[in-house]
């Protein structure tokens, strides 16, 4: 085989270096950008720990596999026969033997290095397994079978499995390498009837096979612990009767056989033949089939299944206890009460309920995003999330009230075609503007047939225009970090010292960012880095990027928290809150496991999927342990990320605090103002309510029979016109209500539960968000000897009521579309009250929903009215709705469009001074538009200043201010 010239070798090496540089360059660039970002949020130790954990684990695993392969190739090559007989002139191995001999160093080192790199890249992804093992924390609970602390299964066993699996890989790769080498160099010959195996080949391969079988013995030993997560029985997770009485002893038997089989392979070194290890291997295989598979199957078929309710009672009892503990639905967290479920109440009993009735929420956060968009924003580059949020605030009189809340965020996807320049997207339209809230229990005025007004939220706005001094005051209403921002929505803020502001703030003013968020762009090197990272040369040539410039990226609050805490699963619905005058995004973080012994395996994504839109879906991964251990906040102005421990007893959180010390702040650092806005998280509640449909049962026999199981009902309003949709679960709803045992209304997350495969209501569950009893779950269990209608039955009843079917304003009207809002189920005076708002949306461009009617159902009676009070009185009688909170606020003009202030008196016209002031405003506006189109920030700042001065002169002359 011809050799390459020195020049060819150099060119080949240079080409390889360039190729590697191109492949690794983007990764190195991304790593440096991440390093800068972690420095911005003050969490570089998180980045460093991940990098060194991955690097260390990858190098160790790669070196282990590579060295084992290298050693075996070297042994096989050094022990090759001196004289190798050939089968003839056309011997196919001769050519390979020649190449391998001439390139022995290339193959001897190159193949192990390549395999080592592949192994290292694969193994590094298990860095979390290593870190949890190194920082294992005891649970203080033991499993019922072996008596091991739960931490053995959650933190230690996965690491032993990791070591075992890579040992298998190393031995297998070494065996294959040795086998091929011996075959090529004549240590193994297939000629003749039985072939020939040289002594060195027999010894080396026997040792490797013996080590492999010895590892299999260890595998059988560890399998015993894995049985505590068995899924043999579809009803529950955990070791079944068959697992305990058949597979458990079988694993020990197979382990012993595997040890003898390994000894047989080692004995082959001295016995000079492979017959004994071959027989031992056959024995191991037959034993694994007969004893490991056939015997358990026979026991299961003929002993367990005919008596399953008795045989599996112990396992079910263990599963019940473990599941309740792992998912936080034990007696210490869940209170189950029998609830009468009355079907008849007097008007006085309803009116006396001053905790729930006055606070019934009429605004649906899943419906009103378009209404918020059209009525509270003036420009196309602002937007709201598809799903609004529900939170609570105290009125000046101390009364707690729930609100629909949202941030008016920047939405670069909404920019018009002539606004799509790079400068506009990344340097002008950099931030949102305002915290928007609306009391959830009322509208501006009642909707009247034939009118265009009424049925709109009563907006309370804190934005730049009013200096953040709305009903809920905000120190700085500018929003630089929000849910509508994706990976490509970076913003460049700041600039050259003394330069005019360029960031759009209002039509009258521009702004220069003054917060601590962002990565400095002052150095040419950083500009070069980001130019390469985003593939954008403007970073290098735009003169507005100066020494004080900074770049903001990773601006989605959920993404920011995920990077800071990669070990957390995050709730899909971040929400904004005003805390001490600052706008904070609050995100719930979960610690999860999938290896808690005997605890029920649950698909996280499936359990949290419902008809809710506008939220992040959870990955459909199995979990059997979950805790809401962390609450995270992201400042909407400066992007700072703070994590707080809210379940400091959680062993998983403690382990991760050992990995990343100081990243999660202790609970004592949570301010009372922040704690007042903590909500019980939706995704955790969805998982828990799903499990409570089964795990409210305490008796193994009842659990096995399923006869008292419940289920989450399908959302009766998911089709938009009512109608059940069996594929979608009804979401839980946040409400402000007072249930039995509470002395005042509290903010809580609630859900109705129906009987299994039935539509009648079986239970109602709520989770408290009140700081005094946060996290406590209450289940109101309805009597089984009566039939209380469930959500779908009530929805059908509501829609078939003559008052509804005969209403041509809302239904069967080609000019409008009726939208059924969330169907709330509320405990009131011993019964269950259903309330559902109905919205209409005109079939016109730029139309938006408005509240038109309220449906109420109780005890088979339906109320249908423009107001909640009217609907209650239709059901219960006069006086029942006197405490309902949906009457228009005092002094509200029912004909005034929402979100607007009453018009002030127009200034006198005709004076020369006024005429000149108006002309100056028009001239200044033209200057602003011209400067925006040109992208000249100096001109833009001067134009804004000119406009501001013209407006001030106009106001001084008696004009209306903005």
Curated annotation (Swiss-Prot):
InterPro entries: UPF0182 (IPR005372). The keyword Transmembrane helix applies. Keywords: Cell membrane, Membrane, Transmembrane, Transmembrane helix. Residues 707-730, 876-916 are annotated as: Disordered. It comes from the Bacteria. One of its GO terms (cellular component) is plasma membrane. The keyword Zinc does not apply. Its main location: membrane. Residues 899-910 have a biased composition (Pro residues). The chain crosses the membrane at residues 10-30, 55-75, 106-126, 168-188, 203-223, 250-270, 279-299. Coiled coil: none annotated. It is found in: Cell membrane. It is a multi-pass membrane protein. Belongs to the UPF0182 family. PANTHER family: UPF0182 PROTEIN SLL1060. NCBIfam families: PRK00068.1, PRK12438.1. This is UPF0182 protein SACE_1102. It comes from Saccharopolyspora erythraea (strain ATCC 11635 / DSM 40517 / JCM 4748 / NBRC 13426 / NCIMB 8594 / NRRL 2338).
């Amino acid at each position: 085989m011809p050799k390459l010239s020195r020049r060819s070798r150099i060119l080949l090496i240079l080409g390889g270096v360039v190729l590697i540089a191109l492949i690794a360059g983007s990764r190195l660039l991304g790593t440096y950008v991440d390093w800068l970002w972690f420095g911005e949020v003050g969490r570089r130790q998180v980045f460093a720990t991940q990098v060194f954990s991955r690097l260390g684990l990858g190098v160790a695993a790669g070196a282990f596999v590579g060295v084992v392969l290298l050693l075996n190739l070297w042994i096989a090559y050094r022990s090759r026969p001196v004289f190798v007989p050939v089968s003839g002139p056309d011997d196919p191995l001769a050519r390979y033997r020649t190449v391998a001999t001439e390139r022995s160093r290339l193959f001897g080192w190159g193949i192990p290095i390549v395999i080592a790199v592949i192994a290292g890249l694969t193994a590094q992804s298990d860095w979390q397994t290593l870190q949890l093992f190194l920082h294992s924390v005891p649970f203080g609970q033991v499993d019922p079978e072996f008596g091991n602390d739960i931490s053995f299964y959650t933190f230690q066993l996965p690491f032993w499995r990791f070591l075992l699996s890579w040992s298998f890989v190393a031995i297998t790769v070494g065996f294959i390498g040795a086998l091929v080498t011996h075959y090529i160099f004549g240590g193994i010959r297939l000629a003749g009837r039985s072939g020939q195996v040289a002594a060195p080949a027999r010894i080396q391969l026997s040792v490797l096979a013996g080590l492999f079988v010895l590892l299999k013995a260890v595998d059988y030993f560890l399998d015993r612990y894995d049985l505590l997560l068995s899924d043999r029985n579809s009803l529950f997770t955990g070791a079944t009767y068959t697992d305990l009485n058949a597979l458990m002893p079988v694993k020990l038997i197979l382990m012993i056989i595997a040890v003898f089989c390994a000894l047989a392979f080692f004995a082959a070194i001295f016995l000079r033949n492979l017959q004994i290890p071959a027989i031992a291997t056959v024995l191991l295989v037959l034993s694994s089939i007969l004893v490991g598979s056939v015997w358990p199957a026979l026991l299961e078929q003929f002993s367990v299944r005919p008596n399953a309710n008795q045989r599996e009672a112990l396992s079910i009892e263990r599963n019940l206890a473990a599941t309740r503990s792992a998912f936080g639905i034990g007696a210490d967290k869940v209170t189950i009460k029998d609830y009468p479920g009355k079907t008849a109440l007097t008007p006085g009993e309803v009116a006396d309920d001053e905790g729930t009735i006055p606070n019934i929420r009429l605004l649906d956060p899943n419906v009103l995003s378009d209404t918020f968009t059209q009525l509270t924003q003036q420009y196309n580059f602002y937007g709201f999330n598809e799903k609004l949020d529900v939170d609570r605030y105290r009125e000046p009189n101390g009364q707690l009230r729930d609100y629909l809340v949202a941030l008016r965020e920047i939405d670069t996807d909404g920019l018009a075609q002539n606004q799509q320049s790079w400068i506009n997207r990344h340097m002008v339209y950099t931030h949102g503007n305002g915290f928007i809230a609306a009391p959830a229990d009322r509208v501006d005025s009642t909707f009247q047939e034939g009118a265009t007004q009424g049925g709109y939220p009563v907006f309370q706005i804190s934005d730049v225009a009013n200096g953040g001094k709305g009903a809920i005051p905000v120190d700085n209403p500018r929003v630089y970090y929000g849910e509508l921002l994706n990976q490509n929505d970076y913003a460049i803020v700041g600039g050259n010292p003394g330069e005019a502001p360029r960031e759009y703030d209002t039509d009258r003013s521009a702004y220069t960012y003054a917060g601590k968020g962002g990565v400095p762009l002052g150095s040419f090197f950083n500009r070069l880095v980001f130019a390469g990272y985003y593939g954008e040369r403007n970073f290098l040539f735009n003169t507005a990027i100066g020494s004080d410039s900074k770049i903001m990226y990773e601006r989605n609050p959920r993404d920011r928290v995920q990077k800071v805490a990669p070990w957390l699963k995050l709730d899909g619905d971040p929400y904004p809150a005003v805390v001490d005058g600052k706008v904070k995004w609050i995100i719930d973080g979960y610690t999860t496991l999938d290896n808690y012994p005997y605890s029920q395996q649950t698909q996280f994504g499936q359990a949290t999927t419902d008809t809710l839109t506008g939220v992040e879906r959870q990955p459909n991964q199995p979990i059997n342990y979950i805790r809401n251990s962390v609450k995270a906040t992201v400042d909407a102005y400066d992007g700072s990320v703070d994590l707080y421990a809210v379940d400091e007893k959680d062993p998983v959180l403690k382990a991760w605090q050992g990995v990343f010390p100081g990243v999660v702040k202790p609970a004592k650092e949570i301010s009372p103002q922040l704690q007042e806005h903590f909500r019980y998280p939706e995704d955790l509640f969805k998982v828990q309510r799903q499990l409570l449909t089964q795990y409210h049962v305490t008796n193994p026999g009842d659990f096995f029979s399923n006869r008292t199981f419940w289920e989450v009902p399908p959302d009766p309003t998911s089709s938009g016109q009512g109608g059940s949709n069996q594929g979608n679960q009804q979401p839980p709803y946040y409400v402000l209500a007072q249930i039995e045992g509470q002395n005042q209304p509290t903010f809580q997350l609630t859900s109705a539960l129906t009987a299994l495969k039935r539509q009648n209501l079986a239970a109602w569950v709520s989770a408290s968000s009140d700081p005094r009893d946060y996290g406590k779950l209450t289940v109101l269990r309805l009597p089984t000897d009566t039939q209380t209608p469930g959500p779908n039955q009530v929805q059908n009843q509501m829609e078939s009521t003559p008052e509804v079917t005969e209403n041509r304003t809302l239904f069967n009207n080609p000019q409008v579309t009726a939208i059924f809002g969330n169907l709330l189920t509320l405990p009131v005076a011993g019964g269950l009250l259903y309330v559902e708002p109905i919205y209409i949306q005109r079939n016109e461009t730029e139309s938006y929903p408005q509240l038109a009617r309220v449906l109420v159902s109780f005890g088979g009676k339906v109320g249908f009215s423009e107001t909640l009070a009217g609907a209650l009185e239709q059901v219960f009688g006069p006086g029942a709705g006197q405490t309902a909170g949906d009457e228009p606020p005092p002094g509200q003009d029912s004909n005034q469009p929402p979100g607007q202030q009453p018009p002030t008196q127009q200034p006198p016209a005709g004076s020369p001074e006024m005429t000149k002031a108006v002309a100056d405003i028009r001239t200044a506006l033209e200057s602003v538009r011209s400067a925006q189109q040109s992208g000249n920030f100096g001109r833009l700042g001067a134009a804004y200043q000119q406009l501001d001065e013209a407006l001030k002169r106009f106001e001084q002359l008696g004009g209306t201010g903005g």
